[in-house]
Amino acid sequence: MSTVASAPAALKGGEWIIRESKPEDIFTPEDFNEEQKMIMGMCTTFVSNEVLPIIERIDKLEPGLMPSLLDKAGEQGLLGVSIPEEYGGLGKDFVTSTLVNEGLGSGFSFSVAIAAHTGIGTLPILYFGTPEQKQKYIPKLTTGEWKGSYGLTEPNSGSDALSAKTSAKLSSDGKYYLLNGQKCWITNGG
């Protein structure tokens, strides 16, 4: 039995469909190390203790409830599992991050909120941001002080990003952006 479950080199695009997998590239729950199991347990405990008891209040969109849950998740390090330590994250590997997603996955709409925060709001900055952007945004997103949100769907284009009409134009003084357009909803917008 392996002492550490780790993923092989990253696949590109849909390569997993056409590439043959070697048995040593496959891992099962029996291969997870103690730390990975502990983190997974922390996630399932978080959902059981913090999310599920108030699920009806979440479903009724009680103001401030979802942001407070994201704050609690940030306090426990759950918003920064795959974020490098230099930005305040835990710096864990892909397998551990996947276990966190599985552990939080039973949290109904909370699972969507945390996935949008990390997968749409934080990770693109980590992967594609400038060093200045990473330093400015990632630490506060990792703690939950700032919330990652996402607004795609528009009345006349649905969720077709290429048909979106909303624009962002830099102000004449270069200090902020002026947004112009409509969105049907914004994930984590409240």
Indicate where each model-derived feature is located:
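Buried hydrophobic positions in well-ordered alpha/beta secondary-structure cores of metabolic enzymes
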Residues: 36, 47, 77, 84, ...
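Internal helix-loop-helix
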Residues: 12, 75-144, 188-189
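Mature N-terminal segment immediately following signal peptide/propeptide cleavage
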Residues: 30-51
